[in-house]
Amino acid sequence: MSELTKTEKRAVILLSGGLDSATVVAMARAEGYVCYTMSFDYGQRHRAELDAAARVAGDLGAVEHKVIGLNLNGIGGSALTDSSIAVPESPSEGIPVTYVPARNTVFLSLALGWAEVLGARDIFIGVNAVDYSGYPDCRPEFVESFERMANLATKAGVEGQGFTIRAPLQNLSKSDIVKAGTALGVDYSLTVSCYQADDQGRACGKCDSCRLRAEGFTAAGIADPTRYF
């Protein structure tokens, strides 16, 4: 192992291919991290996000982009993994049916495993608790609790080489996220946020994710490159 490899600052970054996670990759890169990105083919209906994730990883200089296959549609329970459940096209009360049971817990666990193998001590996730859909696994207390678990459940953690779960977007509005990413050179035309995106990555313009994205660009005063079908 070279001296550079020994001393480089590595991070594993969960990259869905959407606006938030693309911004997080740019933020980590700006902090000097060598970026390893991880996406999941979990049976989601909006599979165009996987192509978007690969584009973003390449554009932002990730040294490795890994796609993990999971069969969360075998569990179901979400409009994103069960085609018999419609994606809502208007805001609803409570936790919406687009919540995927335990998704961020599963994703962070696999990112944690890869981070331990790589010798990375920082794991980035693009969760947000301001302009968001109300998912329980996007809240600060979830991130803090997972970090405690990570340091109890791993060889590196119990040997004192602790992990940090970084959620730099946690308290930002969607417009602040758009502004930050734009300043860091994120090409948002490469991203896909829509829960019902077609194979070409074109958005429905009606789902909660589309609404939050459009409102963010409008509030930021930045042109929205989203393509619609």
Curated annotation (Swiss-Prot):
Record-linked SUPFAM superfamilies: Adenine nucleotide alpha hydrolases-like
EC number: 6.3.4.20
Record field: catalytic activity: 7-carboxy-7-deazaguanine + NH4(+) + ATP = 7-cyano-7-deazaguanine + ADP + phosphate + H2O + H(+)
Amino-acid positions noted as binding Zn(2+) in the UniProt annotation, renumbered to this chain: C194, C204, C207, C210
Pfam families per the UniProt record, alphabetical: QueC
Biological processes, Gene Ontology terms: queuosine biosynthetic process
Keyword Secreted attributed: no
Xref: CDD domains: QueC-like
Keywords noted in UniProt: ATP-binding, Ligase, Metal-binding, Nucleotide-binding, Queuosine biosynthesis, Zinc
GO MF annotation terms: ATP binding; ligase activity, forming carbon-nitrogen bonds; zinc ion binding
Cofactors required: Zn(2+)
Binding site for ATP: L15, S16, G17, G18, L19, D20, S21, A22, T23, V24, V25
Pathway: Purine metabolism; 7-cyano-7-deazaguanine biosynthesis
Manner of cofactor binding, per the entry note: Binds 1 zinc ion per subunit.
Function: Catalyzes the ATP-dependent conversion of 7-carboxy-7-deazaguanine (CDG) to 7-cyano-7-deazaguanine (preQ(0)).
Family to which this protein belongs: Belongs to the QueC family.
PANTHER family per the UniProt record, alphabetical: 7-CYANO-7-DEAZAGUANINE SYNTHASE (PTHR42914:SF1)
NCBIfam families, alphabetized: 7-cyano-7-deazaguanine synthase QueC
The protein's name in its UniProt record: 7-cyano-7-deazaguanine synthase
Organism: Pseudomonas syringae pv. syringae (strain B728a)
